[in-house]
Amino acid sequence: MKLILLGAPGAGKGTQAQFICQKFGIPQISTGDMLRAAVKAGTPLGLEAKKVMDAGGLVSDDIIIGLVKERIAQADCANGFLFDGFPRTIPQAEAMKAAGVNLDFVVEIDVPDSAIVERMSGRRVHVASGRTYHVKFNPPKVAGKDDETGEDLIQRADDNEETVLKRLAVYHEQTEVLVGYYSNMAASGDKTAPTYVKIPGVGSVDGIRDAIFRALGA
């Protein structure tokens, strides 16, 4: 089972990725983890990536694709893998295809922007313990206070509405085009095309999980 999960920040990809990886016995692979592991191991690609990062640059798609090929050749990928946050752009998707990295499924978790803003801007955190709340979906017993300690809850900078809207704008501009790329590829009759699946991401976590499993034939 080789697949990628697409969806805006806050769509619930992280939660669903864990369910999928447990169900199919596959690793979740993120470019960040790959880069850190390669740099730590001192591989040729890792050293190349480190040079770029130390200079404050963006690691090229060529290096990323090289790392992907190295990573998926490892033993834990024998049954497949789930790409998290990769590919992000059409050039990356095309480079991956050219490198012979084929996928079985592309799963898009589709959540309206308004629901994502509500989800993320309503989050509140107790910094010391890491306990999280939501003003609507999981409110503390006393507004703005941690249930255990009574200490103040905060809204992380990442979760304020303005920041969420900016991140959504970047997603729509850069990554959402992949939705069209993969759905067109699937419709074109290309034999290497992955099956493209769109799952509504509003509802219970378990309901969304079950819909994804059905789509993946599990």
Curated annotation (Swiss-Prot):
It comes from Laribacter hongkongensis (strain HLHK9). The keyword Transmembrane helix does not apply. Its EC number is 2.7.4.3. HAMAP family: Adenylate_kinase_Adk. Pathway: Purine metabolism; AMP biosynthesis via salvage pathway; AMP from ADP: step 1/1. One of its GO terms (cellular component) is cytoplasm. GO terms for biological process: AMP salvage. Residues 30-59 are annotated as: NMP. InterPro entries: Adenyl_kin_sub (IPR006259), Adenylat/UMP-CMP_kin (IPR000850), Adenylat_kinase_CS (IPR033690), Adenylate_kinase_lid-dom (IPR007862), P-loop_NTPase (IPR027417). Monomer. Belongs to the adenylate kinase family. Catalyzes the reversible transfer of the terminal phosphate group between ATP and AMP. Plays an important role in cellular energy homeostasis and in adenine nucleotide metabolism. This is Adenylate kinase. Consists of three domains, a large central CORE domain and two small peripheral domains, NMPbind and LID, which undergo movements during catalysis. The LID domain closes over the site of phosphoryl transfer upon ATP binding. Assembling and dissambling the active center during each catalytic cycle provides an effective means to prevent ATP hydrolysis. ATP binds at G10, A11, G12, K13, G14, T15, R123, T132, Y133, G203. It is found in: Cytoplasm. It holds the Pfam family ADK_lid.
